[in-house]
Amino acid sequence: MATRIAPSADVSQDAALGEGTSIWHLAQVRERAVLGRDCIVGRGAYIGEGVVMGDNCKVQNYALVYEPARLADGVFIGPAVTLTNDHFPRAVNPDGTLKSASDWEPVGVTIDEGASIGARAVCVAPVHVGAWATVAAGAVVTKDVPAHALVAGVPARRIGWVGRAGEPLVPAEAGPDGAPRWRCPVSGTLYQEAGSESDTTIREVTH
């Protein structure tokens, strides 16, 4: 399937778009951006210079994905989401002169496979969002998000776990070692917690 670019979209000739990718009205895709197959970039969205996106990503209307963000396969970026690239932003240098590209080094947000960022959430670079995690609408992410975590609030904190289907996991019988377990209500997949209270992760288990 060929790529589709709306007449009002601004796509650099130096950008690379995978087969089947669609760029909708008023969206901008900057120089050296690389988008995989079957991606969708919604109306008014911005994809920064050199941003890399995997296959089957969705960037919804008016989202801002600043360079050098890295999005793996199947990432969802909700409407009006912002992925920042400057941890200490200033318009001017200490001497009052206007900052140029040579006066600062951009840092990017990294989002792993299948993760979702809800509408109007902000991810403050250089955070890393783990695979299949969900960031709730309006959250401000200032710390790394573990895989399968559900985070919400300002600043974002983990309030639960989610499975690949995106729905919150429900409590299940504890594992043989007493570790908390969770089950996906859609697929039935079982997960078990590991790590310390301040650094908890989750992984799939077979029994």
Residue ranges and their predicted role:
Residues A2-P7, S22-H128:
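Flexible, glycine/small-residue-enriched loop-and-beta-strand segment within the central core
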Residues A131-T134, V140:
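Internal alpha/beta core interface subdomains
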Residues N56, Q60, L98, E113, ...:
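Short Cys/His-rich Zn2+-coordinating modules
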Residues E173-P180:
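Short linker/helix segments within small regulatory modules
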